[in-house]
């Protein structure tokens, strides 16, 4: 504070009585009075540490942890200040946030403060994230929400064609019998009852076996004949020449070409038909059209 001028009354706010400064008093007395007032005002102001404020980092983090946020923040800040060796009045510490020191106040939240997290060893931080013992919530452990076990997909069973129970086994013809049957089929594809009975007895076969063999052989001959006809049709089909550069020419020789050109040039013959404009075919002129605009000298 600045010293007051001589001859001015100053009302002391501390003691509540006026202090007159006369002409006989020197400037040293006025300076002493001002110094006393400043000391008293400074002593009346409480000293509050910025770490104990409700908007500090410790207080904000403690508010999200437990309902006793202010008490836990005060305890964490007191522990940090005691470790650093900072002195602070007891009355200010207990009355700044309206909390009293009691043995029942919770103090384990110091580990969740910024200073506690920074001071923790790396093993403690890594251990919480290690997948050795994965912790699950109770609703995840219930079988209702657990994933179903993987099912092994078995290959589908191959369904075979079922034959009749009274199906006769296939007759194993010998080479001599097959040659005789082929020779007889070339001679005659259909056998009468008497011919079939005589031929089957000569080959030591039954009439039914000879009859079925001739039926199968006729079906095979029909399939081969149809395949040969299809090949002949494909060979007899004329190969159409591809259109050169997309230009098709009418059939009939040069006369047909001239007739078509005249029809396109003069249009169809009729009393009310307008003459069509001649169109130059593409590719007939090798020089560019723009060259005809200039006169060569």
UniProtKB/Swiss-Prot annotation:
A GO cellular component entry from the record: nuclear periphery
Family, per entry: Belongs to the Msh homeobox family.
Biased segments, Basic and acidic residues type: 127-136
Feature: compositional bias, Low complexity: 71-87
Swiss-Prot/TrEMBL GO biological process terms: embryonic morphogenesis; inner ear development; negative regulation of gene expression; negative regulation of odontoblast differentiation; nose development; positive regulation of cell cycle; positive regulation of odontogenesis; regulation of odontogenesis
Annotated region of DNA binding: 166-225
Subcellular location, principal: nucleus
Region ranges (Disordered): 68-114, 127-157
Cell compartment(s), UniProt: Nucleus
Subunit description: Interacts with CREBBP/CBP, TBP and SP1; interaction with these transcription activators may inhibit autoinactivation. Interacts (via C-terminus) with PIAS1 (via N-terminus). Interacts with H1-5.
InterPro entries: HD (IPR001356), HD_metazoa (IPR020479), Homeobox_CS (IPR017970), Homeodomain-like_sf (IPR009057), Msh_Homeobox_Regulators (IPR050674)
GO molecular function annotations of the record: DNA-binding transcription factor activity, RNA polymerase II-specific; RNA polymerase II transcription regulatory region sequence-specific DNA binding; transcription cis-regulatory region binding
Name of encoding gene: MSX1
PTM annotation, UniProt: Sumoylated by PIAS1, desumoylated by SENP1. Sumoylation of Lys-9 and Lys-127 not required for interaction with H1-5, transcriptional repression, inhibition of myoblast differentiation, or binding to gene promoters.
Taxonomic source organism: Perodicticus potto edwarsi
Pfam families given in the database record: Homeodomain
Name of the protein in its database record: Homeobox protein MSX-1
Record's keyword annotation contains Nucleotide-binding: no
Keywords: Developmental protein, DNA-binding, Homeobox, Isopeptide bond, Nucleus, Repressor, Transcription, Transcription regulation, Ubl conjugation
Entries under CDD domains matching the protein: homeodomain
Placement of covalent cross-link Glycyl lysine isopeptide (Lys-Gly) (interchain with G-Cter in SUMO): 9, 127
Role, per record: Acts as a transcriptional repressor. Capable of transcription autoinactivation. Binds to the consensus sequence 5'-C/GTAAT-3' in downstream activin regulatory elements (DARE) in the gene promoter, thereby repressing the transcription of CGA/alpha-GSU and GNRHR. Represses transcription of myoblast differentiation factors. Binds to core enhancer regions in target gene promoters of myoblast differentiation factors with binding specificity facilitated by interaction with PIAS1.
């Amino acid at each position: 504070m600045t010293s007051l001028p001589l001859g001015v009354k100053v009302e002391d706010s501390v003691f509540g009585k006026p202090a007159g400064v006369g002409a006989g008093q020197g400037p040293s007395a006025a300076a002493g009075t001002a110094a006393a007032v400043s000391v008293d005002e400074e002593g009346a102001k409480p000293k509050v540490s910025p770490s104990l404020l409700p908007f500090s980092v410790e207080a904000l983090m403690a508010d999200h942890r437990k309902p006793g946020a202010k008490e836990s923040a005060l305890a964490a800040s007191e522990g940090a200040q005691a470790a650093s060796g900072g002195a602070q009045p007891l009355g200010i510490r207990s009355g700044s946030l309206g909390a009293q020191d009691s043995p029942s106040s919770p103090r384990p939240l110091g580990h969740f403060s910024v200073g506690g997290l920074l001071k923790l060893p790396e093993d403690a931080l890594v251990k919480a994230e290690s997948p050795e013992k994965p912790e699950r919530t109770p609703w995840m452990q219930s079988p209702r929400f657990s994933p179903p076990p993987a099912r092994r997909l078995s290959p589908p069973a191959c369904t075979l064609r079922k034959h009749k129970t009274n199906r006769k086994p296939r007759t194993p013809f010998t080479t001599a019998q097959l040659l005789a049957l082929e020779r007889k089929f070339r001679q005659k594809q259909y056998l009468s009852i008497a011919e079939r009975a005589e031929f089957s007895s000569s080959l030591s076969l039954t009439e039914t076996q000879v009859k079925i063999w001739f039926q199968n052989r006729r079906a095979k001959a029909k399939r081969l004949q149809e395949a040969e006809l299809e090949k002949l049709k494909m060979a007899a089909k004329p190969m159409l020449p591809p259109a050169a550069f997309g230009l098709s020419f009418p059939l009939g020789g040069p006369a047909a070409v001239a007739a078509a050109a005249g029809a396109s040039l003069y249009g169809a013959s009729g009393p009310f038909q307008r003459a069509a404009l001649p169109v130059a075919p593409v590719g007939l002129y090798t020089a560019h059209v723009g060259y005809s605009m200039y006169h060569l000298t």
